[in-house]
Regions:
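Transmembrane alpha-helices and adjacent helix-loop boundaries
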Residues: 2-283
Length: 283
């Protein structure tokens, strides 16, 4: 009897249940220790303080890039998802082609192709149209294709839009067809049925993958460093590369970069889980 009690997964002490060591989330403990060590070096080492100060300004640019890119990706994903479930052959074919091509190409290649092939071509085309129509305001709009930040946003949003298209499609198809039929029987059009009945329910279903993709985009925003940026406005990874190359402090630089990304990812994970619990579909 005594041996059975000792093998239980919890121990009783002072009338309270305490987890045994094997039930403690040790990965959190290890991360906390590593984070505290790096924070200690940052607060006590002049070299770490200089590195961290230089990199910290890249956090804002990284968050801006992620948020703006994700908002565009949500739009592209919704359009692609609706196209994927469309019964119109042309629309369905175009949406499927977009999804399959983008998902079949590495995101880094997508970013480079958009930044150095599509964006310059689009900028030149808009300028020619503006000249032909004598419309200077159109030429001013071409800055979207010339600005490094906007090219990064377009690359991330188009790349992640393909993945979000499948998320939207799966979420919409998870809703019972009876919901659509009931809405149509009440006199709603197909678009109204999607907008007021199907999509509100689908969004609650797809919240977890949407949140995961947002965090994934935060980390993949580091790929934008491959297309270059204005130094004072560089995102975190590019600032790390610049600082490491000029000071030769690779150890301090990449420890700080990793810590900053980890802090942002864990912080967003907490927010995403809170939103999921608040808006999740009851089981």
């Amino acid at each position: 009897m005594t041996s059975q009690v000792e093998r239980q997964s919890t121990a009783i002490k002072g009338g309270r249940l305490l987890p045994l060591p094997r039930n403690i989330p040790w990965w959190i403990v290890i991360l906390a220790i590593c984070g505290l060590l790096i924070l200690y070096f940052i607060t006590t080492s002049t070299s770490y303080q200089e590195t961290f100060t230089f990199l910290a300004s890249g956090v804002i640019r990284t968050l801006q890039l992620t948020v703006v890119g994700y908002l565009f990706a949500l739009v592209f994903g919704l359009i692609g998802g609706l196209g994927r479930i469309s019964k119109n052959t042309v629309i369905n074919t175009v949406a499927t082609l977009y999804v399959e091509v983008i998902r079949g190409v590495p995101l880094l290649v997508v970013l480079i192709y958009i930044a150095f092939v599509l964006a310059p071509a689009a900028s030149s085309l808009v300028s020619q149209i503006a000249t032909a129509l004598n419309a200077p305001f159109l030429d001013n709009m071409a800055f979207v294709f010339r600005d490094d930040f906007m090219r990064g946003v377009l690359g991330l949003s188009i790349g992640y839009g393909a993945y979000l298209s499948e998320v939207y499609r799966a979420g919409i198809e998870s809703i019972s067809r009876g919901q659509m039929e009931a809405a149509r029987s009440l006199g709603m059009s197909y678009g109204q049925s999607l907008r007021y009945v199907v999509l509100p329910q689908a969004v609650r279903v797809i919240l977890p993958p949407l949140g995961n993709d947002f965090i994934a985009m935060l980390k993949d925003s580091s790929l934008v460093s491959a297309i270059g940026a204005v130094p004072l406005e560089a995102e975190l990874t590019l600032r790390g590369r610049m600082y490491s190359a000029t000071t030769y402090k690779a150890f301090e630089t990449w420890n700080s970069v990793a810590l900053l990304y980890l802090m942002m990812s864990l912080g967003l994970s907490v927010i995403v889980r809170y939103v999921e619990r608040r808006w999740s579909v009851p089981k």
